[in-house]
């Protein structure tokens, strides 16, 4: 028996400040129960413009259920959560005297609402005020996000499969430079995430499926992560398995609420390993650069980049990738091919050409991508522009 710790895996499993996940119940009922549990009296709703314009969508049903507890709605959040939308929403919530925020929407809405919490806590009034609090600041320039003792919190009702409701991080876009900025605080994670498959029925299929491939990206990259461990691996693998099976079922029958709930469970499992410490890699890092620069949906960046990254990484982790193939009963099919086939089956873009990106953009994308730590956390670490370009060429 060896008593030498140097032979043991070393890591930290991060627990989130999330109290509950409510699943399989009507969102309006679940929100009202959570509001009553928390003793909130002035509830402020956030969403994107499309949901805000529905006559009887999840936002409208929640608003009716809240009755006189509803103190306002901000339905102007755009894709990629621009800083301007964060500040405008925070000012509106502050003016309304909100004591609880409820985000109803996809990743951009939930991320923006998390950043709104920070803006309310720190009394930020302009987009520029946010800059000192972003992650990965140069040494000496960063300011910590501080939540007051009675910090306003949020609930999240997801209408997509982005999984933003399970993380304490907010991805926000700086419009002038087209760069994605990350903000985080442990209390920015929603107190409760509500998974109601019915709330996804009004989501266009392309949006639902492209966020689903983003969830696949979470599962696959966290499973392949050098920081994966026996606690995170089952989460990532089950997330991939559930998504690979449920998404074709949803495509075959869009009204199948059981398949939609299984996809929500898959999305939840997929992100769980990542936020616990098994970090994502180059597909995410390059995807951040693509999304912010060319206004490409995060899910579409995963559709395009994940197969290419898997192929590039296979030189160092082919055995690991085979476990992904075995998990869905196809051990002899490369994981990259399985992901690409799922993307194609769902009618999503499968190449950079499909999203309007050509070789003339590669050098700029590579330069922007290198700032993201995900590239250094990749199973095959990336530190040079030419390495990013190699991957981009696999995605043409």
Task: Show where each model-derived region lies.
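Buried hydrophobic positions in well-ordered alpha/beta secondary-structure cores of metabolic enzymes
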Residues: 24, 45, 82, 107, ...
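Short glycine/serine/threonine-rich phosphate/pyrophosphate-binding segments
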Residues: 28-32, 54-56, 83-86, 108-113, ...
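Short Gly/Thr/Asp-enriched flexible loops that form oxyanion-binding sites at enzyme active sites
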Residues: 60-61, 89-90, 109-123, 167-168
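Glycine/serine-rich anion-binding loops at beta->alpha junctions
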Residues: 98-116, 159-164, 293-296
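A glycine/threonine-rich phosphate-anchoring loop and its flanking beta-alpha core
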Residues: 122-230, 320-323
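Active-site segments that bind and position negatively charged phosphate/pyrophosphate groups
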Residues: 222-338
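C-terminal charged capping/lid subdomain of soluble metabolic enzymes
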Residues: 325-396
